[in-house]
């Protein structure tokens, strides 16, 4: 044990010895025990299943119980059709009762891969004695499964594992007792419930919920139940439930105030390939440059959210010592120092020469309204060459800028080597704003090493100011659309592959090949992605749609909160255009993380009939979840609906008055479904008593059962830490 006051040392993670315990099958000499030895250059050193017909598995038995934190798969030195494209890993203290620890897949390459296994319940580590690996899909369709080498690592120190084992045994027993308590109470077995609770001293739930059960189910005191729900809402107890609900998008077209006599010149015109940033402190959107269909633009605008008005800062920034007209450049804002940086641009091949291909780099100071040229040519200063369709992020805290990817512009005539005709892409650079120095962090690499990253264009890159990581995904490299997703820790210089893009989670991740615009909310740990039109003409018309995705960084999961399809658009094209922006590319999207609002401007609608057409529409997007007020009203509606149904059996006249007054005011009459349900409630007044009650005294049982059902519904809004277990005792009975 550590001495008093000493810092606790994290337990050491080490290799865990195991033996092969059971297997589904094996073929020829490809024995299960081959996975104990790592021989990447020996093609026969592997386990291979006899068929790919499920279930195929290997069960490993650890030398002693351990906290199994990681699993590592070794591979053959070349790609192989039998490698596991999809697999699952289960673990437990006995082979009959296992928990899923991992669902993933291997890349079809020669590099070892390590995965973190689930090893905690409620932040408490739990031990395993058995590990079961279940192959689901091989890289070659209809090929048998092969595993070359498996390594398990974790903690097997008995001083650490034994307390975890004790906790796990106690946890399982406690949950079993809680399931019994829940079952007894649901069926009104009062004596059994009280006896078990008294004997075990185990609480079924938080005392507040026990109080609610007493008032609602036992006493039928509906007013007291409403008061209790109101207190819970005001105390923030429904916040966890709200955070788990899906967002609903709400688009609003912004019609800015116009200044008299200014005509159309008091707001930015139609364009694509422009850039926007937002100052969240002053709620100001800045827009610079772009392409209007015939020429590059050099105008610079500010939109005040509070004033709902655009102001033209400059008609031509070049005349004010600023950047020349440009498109496909990038901007980022330092909100602390109130400065905007811009880098890169696209140049038509006809105007490219050694002078024009210099990569200039500018900074705009918001307070003094002045531009400063930081560099005439960033490549000469150790930074990137002239690029377009790259990405740039600001780290205000450390006063650093990160730029990644983009295609390097080259002169047409120059032929340095055979690679000159192939497109070249820029790597990952860091710019120290204080020292005004560049540093190359990663070169463009097509290798599959753990720290290598592949450059691209049209990708998304975001900086998480709290965990200090860059997140990069999507984009295009020559004709290939990339679907990988990785993070880069700017402080430790480490790349972490979140998804290599090989898994076929079709429909569960944003589609490749479509223009994606992304924003990040460090407070909510969310990445937002608006997916629009493809730049590829062939892909454009087949299924034009917008979709909005959210990536939960903590849960490592994507969810699609909104899609609009071509089919629905054909019928409603006019009204739909007024409700939401049409699909597009070359547009810009910025996010105000303080006020939780997105702003979108312009872009290219990709109309083949009018290729020069650009847009100048301006939209805001709010992602809405149920509010506290909505949930309070909804809970009151559920309680009063049940109260009405009870009244209808006893006193129909009193019930009718209750329906018209008390229940009516809790209904959302703008919701067609809720309105219809409310209207159908009146039919309860005409049901005979026999519709509600059976023989003998079962009318009491019916009321108790109905109230219990309402209680279980209301409990769902409370945090899991307060509620009874989710499962039911009867569900454990298998046929």
UniProtKB/Swiss-Prot annotation:
<feature type="repeat" description="Kelch 4">
    <location>
        <begin position="469"/>
        <end position="515"/>
    </location>
</feature>
<feature type="modified residue" description="N-acetylalanine">
    <location>
        <position position="2"/>
    </location>
</feature>
<dbReference type="InterPro" id="IPR008979">
    <property type="entry name" value="Galactose-bd-like_sf"/>
</dbReference>
<dbReference type="InterPro" id="IPR015915">
    <property type="entry name" value="Kelch-typ_b-propeller"/>
</dbReference>
<keyword id="KW-0539">Nucleus</keyword>
<dbReference type="GO" id="GO:0042802">
    <property type="term" value="F:identical protein binding"/>
</dbReference>
<keyword id="KW-0880">Kelch repeat</keyword>
<feature type="repeat" description="Kelch 5">
    <location>
        <begin position="526"/>
        <end position="578"/>
    </location>
</feature>
<dbReference type="InterPro" id="IPR006595">
    <property type="entry name" value="CTLH_C"/>
</dbReference>
<dbReference type="GO" id="GO:0005737">
    <property type="term" value="C:cytoplasm"/>
</dbReference>
<dbReference type="Pfam" id="PF24981">
    <property type="entry name" value="Beta-prop_ATRN-LZTR1"/>
</dbReference>
<feature type="domain" description="LisH">
    <location>
        <begin position="172"/>
        <end position="204"/>
    </location>
</feature>
<dbReference type="Pfam" id="PF06588">
    <property type="entry name" value="Muskelin_N"/>
</dbReference>
<protein>
    <recommendedName>
        <fullName>Muskelin</fullName>
    </recommendedName>
</protein>
<keyword id="KW-0007">Acetylation</keyword>
<dbReference type="GO" id="GO:0005654">
    <property type="term" value="C:nucleoplasm"/>
</dbReference>
<dbReference type="GO" id="GO:0099164">
    <property type="term" value="C:postsynaptic specialization membrane of symmetric synapse"/>
</dbReference>
<dbReference type="Pfam" id="PF13415">
    <property type="entry name" value="Kelch_3"/>
</dbReference>
<comment type="subunit">
    <text>Homodimer; may form higher oligomers. Identified in the CTLH complex that contains GID4, RANBP9 and/or RANBP10, MKLN1, MAEA, RMND5A (or alternatively its paralog RMND5B), GID8, ARMC8, WDR26 and YPEL5. Within this complex, MAEA, RMND5A (or alternatively its paralog RMND5B), GID8, WDR26, and RANBP9 and/or RANBP10 form the catalytic core, while GID4, MKLN1, ARMC8 and YPEL5 have ancillary roles. Interacts with RANBP9. Part of a complex consisting of RANBP9, MKLN1 and GID8. Interacts with GABRA1. Interacts with the C-terminal tail of PTGER3.</text>
</comment>
<dbReference type="GO" id="GO:0042803">
    <property type="term" value="F:protein homodimerization activity"/>
</dbReference>
<feature type="domain" description="CTLH">
    <location>
        <begin position="206"/>
        <end position="258"/>
    </location>
</feature>
<dbReference type="GO" id="GO:0005829">
    <property type="term" value="C:cytosol"/>
</dbReference>
<feature type="repeat" description="Kelch 3">
    <location>
        <begin position="400"/>
        <end position="458"/>
    </location>
</feature>
<dbReference type="InterPro" id="IPR056737">
    <property type="entry name" value="Beta-prop_ATRN-MKLN-like"/>
</dbReference>
<dbReference type="InterPro" id="IPR006594">
    <property type="entry name" value="LisH"/>
</dbReference>
<dbReference type="InterPro" id="IPR010565">
    <property type="entry name" value="Muskelin_N"/>
</dbReference>
<dbReference type="GO" id="GO:0098982">
    <property type="term" value="C:GABA-ergic synapse"/>
</dbReference>
<keyword id="KW-0677">Repeat</keyword>
<dbReference type="GO" id="GO:0005938">
    <property type="term" value="C:cell cortex"/>
</dbReference>
<dbReference type="InterPro" id="IPR011043">
    <property type="entry name" value="Gal_Oxase/kelch_b-propeller"/>
</dbReference>
<dbReference type="GO" id="GO:0001726">
    <property type="term" value="C:ruffle"/>
</dbReference>
<dbReference type="GO" id="GO:0098968">
    <property type="term" value="P:neurotransmitter receptor transport postsynaptic membrane to endosome"/>
</dbReference>
<dbReference type="GO" id="GO:0008360">
    <property type="term" value="P:regulation of cell shape"/>
</dbReference>
<dbReference type="GO" id="GO:0098895">
    <property type="term" value="C:postsynaptic endosome membrane"/>
</dbReference>
<keyword id="KW-0770">Synapse</keyword>
<dbReference type="GO" id="GO:0002090">
    <property type="term" value="P:regulation of receptor internalization"/>
</dbReference>
<comment type="function">
    <text>Component of the CTLH E3 ubiquitin-protein ligase complex that selectively accepts ubiquitin from UBE2H and mediates ubiquitination and subsequent proteasomal degradation of the transcription factor HBP1. Required for internalization of the GABA receptor GABRA1 from the cell membrane via endosomes and subsequent GABRA1 degradation. Acts as a mediator of cell spreading and cytoskeletal responses to the extracellular matrix component THBS1.</text>
</comment>
<feature type="region of interest" description="Important for location in the cytosol">
    <location>
        <begin position="701"/>
        <end position="735"/>
    </location>
</feature>
<feature type="repeat" description="Kelch 1">
    <location>
        <begin position="284"/>
        <end position="330"/>
    </location>
</feature>
<dbReference type="InterPro" id="IPR052456">
    <property type="entry name" value="CTLH_complex_component"/>
</dbReference>
<dbReference type="GO" id="GO:0007160">
    <property type="term" value="P:cell-matrix adhesion"/>
</dbReference>
<keyword id="KW-0963">Cytoplasm</keyword>
């Amino acid at each position: 044990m550590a001495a008093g006051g000493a810092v606790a040392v994290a337990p050491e993670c080490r290799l865990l010895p195991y033996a092969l315990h059971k297997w589904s099958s094996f073929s020829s000499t490809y024995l299960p025990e081959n996975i104990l030895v790592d021989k990447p250059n020996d093609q026969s050193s592997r386990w291979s299943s006899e068929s790919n017909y499920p279930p195929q598995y290997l069960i490993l038995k650890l030398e002693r119980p351990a906290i199994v934190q990681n699993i590592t798969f070794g591979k053959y030195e070349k790609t192989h059709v039998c490698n596991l494209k999809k697999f699952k890993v289960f673990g437990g203290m006995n082979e009959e009762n296992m928990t899923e620890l991992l669902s993933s897949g291997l890349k079809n390459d020669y590099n070892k891969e390590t995965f973190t296994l689930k090893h905690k319940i409620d932040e408490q580590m739990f031990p395993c004695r058995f590990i079961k690996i279940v192959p689901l899909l091989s890289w070659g369709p209809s090929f048998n499964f092969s595993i070359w080498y498996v390594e398990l690592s974790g903690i097997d120190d008995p001083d650490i594992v034994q307390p975890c084992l004790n906790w796990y045994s106690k946890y399982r027993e406690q949950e079993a007792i809680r399931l019994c308590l829940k079952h007894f109470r649901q069926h009104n077995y009062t004596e059994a419930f009280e006896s078990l609770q008294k004997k075990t001293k185990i609480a079924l739930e938080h005392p507040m919920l026990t109080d609610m059960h007493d008032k609602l189910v036992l006493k039928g005191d509906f007013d007291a139940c409403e008061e209790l729900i109101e207190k819970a809402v005001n105390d923030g107890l429904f916040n966890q439930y709200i955070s788990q609900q899906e967002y609903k998008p709400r688009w609003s077209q912004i019609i800015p105030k116009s200044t008299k006599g200014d005509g159309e010149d008091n707001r930015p015109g139609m364009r694509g390939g422009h850039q926007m940033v937002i100052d969240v402190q002053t709620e100001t959107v800045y827009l610079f440059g772009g392409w209007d269909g015939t020429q590059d633009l050099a105008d610079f605008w500010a939109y005040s959210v509070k004033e709902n008005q655009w102001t033209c800062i400059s008609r031509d920034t070049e005349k004010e010592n600023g950047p020349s007209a440009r498109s496909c450049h990038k901007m980022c804002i330092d909100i602390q120092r109130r400065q905007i940086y811009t880098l890169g641009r696209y140049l038509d091949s006809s105007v490219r020469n050694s002078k024009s291909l210099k990569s200039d780099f500018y900074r705009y100071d918001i307070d003094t309204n002045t531009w400063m040229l930081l560099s005439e040519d960033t490549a000469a200063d150790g930074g990137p060459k002239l690029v377009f369709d790259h990405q740039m992020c600001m780290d205000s805290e450390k006063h650093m800028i990160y730029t990644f990817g983009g295609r390097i512009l080259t002169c047409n005539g120059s032929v340095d080597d055979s690679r000159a005709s192939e497109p070249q892409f820029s790597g990952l650079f860091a710019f120290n704003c204080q020292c005004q120095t560049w540093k190359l962090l990663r070169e463009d690499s097509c290798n599959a090493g753990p720290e290598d990253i592949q450059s691209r264009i049209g990708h998304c890159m975001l900086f998480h100011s709290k965990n200090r990581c860059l997140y990069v995904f999507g984009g295009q490299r020559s004709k290939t659309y990339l679907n990988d997703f990785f993070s880069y820790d700017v402080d430790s210089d480490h790349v972490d592959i979140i998804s290599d893009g090989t898994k076929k989670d079709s429909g569960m991740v944003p589609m490749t090949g479509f223009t994606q615009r992304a924003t990040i909310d460090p407070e909510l740990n969310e990445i937002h992605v608006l997916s629009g039109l493809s730049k590829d003409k062939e892909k454009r018309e087949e299924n034009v749609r917008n979709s909005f995705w959210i990536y939960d960084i903590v849960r490592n999961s994507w969810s699609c909160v909104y899609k609009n399809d071509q089919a629905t658009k054909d019928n409603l094209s006019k009204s739909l255009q007024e409700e939401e922006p049409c699909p597009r590319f070359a547009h810009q999207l910025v996010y105000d993380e303080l006020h939780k609002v997105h702003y979108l401007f312009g872009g290219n609608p990709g109309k083949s009939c009018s290729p020069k057409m650009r847009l100048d529409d301006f939209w805001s997007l709010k992602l809405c979840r149920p509010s506290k007020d909505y949930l309070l009203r909804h809970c009151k509606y559920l309680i009063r609906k049940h109260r009405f149904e009870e009244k209808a059996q006893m006193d129909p006249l009193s019930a009718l008055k209750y329906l018209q007054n008390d229940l009516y005011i809790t209904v959302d009459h703008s919701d067609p479904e809720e309105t219809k349900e409310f209207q159908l409630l009146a039919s309860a007044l005409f049901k005979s008593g026999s519709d509600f009650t059976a023989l003998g005294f079962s009318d009491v049982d019916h009321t108790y059962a109905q109230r219990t059902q309402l209680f279980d519904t209301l409990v769902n809004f409370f945090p899991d830490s307060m509620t009874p277990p989710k499962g039911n005792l009867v569900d454990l009975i298998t046929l």
